């Protein structure tokens, strides 16, 4: 049985029109990649992919990176966002590029 919830409560619970979809991403730099090259690649990733598409990235790593991508504002990532991220990483010849299915970043 569906519950009627107020807009305020739906926003607090991140449901319905306030649901936020995101996806996990992971990749690996080739062995021997310098720290400077890793920093430059991650900076370029943020400047060329994340910011222009109004995405947010929370991740970390050294040679092996993993993280979460979601929207900067309340919203839903799309399969197009996944494809843009995957394509950019693969074009840089990074290894083991993986993106997950879209999931609810608050409830999954």
UniProtKB/Swiss-Prot annotation:
Taxonomy, superkingdom: Bacteria
The family this protein is said to belong to: To H.influenzae HI_0341.
Entry-linked InterPro entries: YggL_50S_bp
Taxonomic lineage: Bacteria, Pseudomonadati, Pseudomonadota, Gammaproteobacteria, Enterobacterales
GO biological process: ribosome assembly
Species this protein is from: Escherichia coli (strain K12)
Transmembrane spans: none
Pfam families: YggL_50S_bp
Gene Ontology CC annotations of this record: cytosol
Protein name according to UniProt: Uncharacterized protein YggL
């Amino acid at each position: 049985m569906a519950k009627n919830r107020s807009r305020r409560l739906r926003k607090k619970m991140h449901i319905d029109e306030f649901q936020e979809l995101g996806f996990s991403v992971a990749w690996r730099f080739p062995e021997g990649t310098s720290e400077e090259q890793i920093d430059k690649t991650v900076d370029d990733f943020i400047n060329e992919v994340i910011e222009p598409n109004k995405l947010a990235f929370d991740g970390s790593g050294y040679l092996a990176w993993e993280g979460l991508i979601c929207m900067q504002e309340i919203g839903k990532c799309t399969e197009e966002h996944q494809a843009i991220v995957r394509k950019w990483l693969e074009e840089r010849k990074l290894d083991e590029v993986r993106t997950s299915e879209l999931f609810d970043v608050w409830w999954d």
